[in-house]
UniProtKB/Swiss-Prot annotation:
NCBIfam families: rplP_bact. Keywords: Ribonucleoprotein, Ribosomal protein, RNA-binding, rRNA-binding, tRNA-binding. Belongs to the universal ribosomal protein uL16 family. This is Large ribosomal subunit protein uL16. The keyword Mitochondrion does not apply. The lineage of its organism: Bacteria, Pseudomonadati, Pseudomonadota, Betaproteobacteria, Burkholderiales. The gene is rplP. Part of the 50S ribosomal subunit.
Amino acid sequence: MLQPSRRKYRKEQKGRNTGLATRGTHVSFGEFGLKATGRGRLTARQIEAARRAINRHIKRGGRIWIRIFPDKPISQKPAEVRMGNGKGNPEYWVAEIQPGKVLYEMEGVSEELAREAFRLAAAKLPISTTFVARHIGA
């Protein structure tokens, strides 16, 4: 599972996920990409599940890049604990996703295979996505 090796602070405030992605909006490494059209949080488990779905479909065909990283800790209090007594402990890690962000990239496979692999991966994710291809010269 993806998570930072170390952080300056263990806990982080909730914040608001607004606006559009300004960085990581183009296919930079591979030929095809899976781009977010919705906004939300992707947990490390969801990122890994989608990666496995892609790998299973393309077998040993191509190369994959994961363009997102879960660097935000989400804390939770245990079940049936009274309010107060401080903030809960970090339970899992998420990546905040804005519309326009490229999540995964792939090369070395045909477009049909890439489309199907990304379709399977998108089913594992809680946000809406679309298939994009690299524009040569852009």
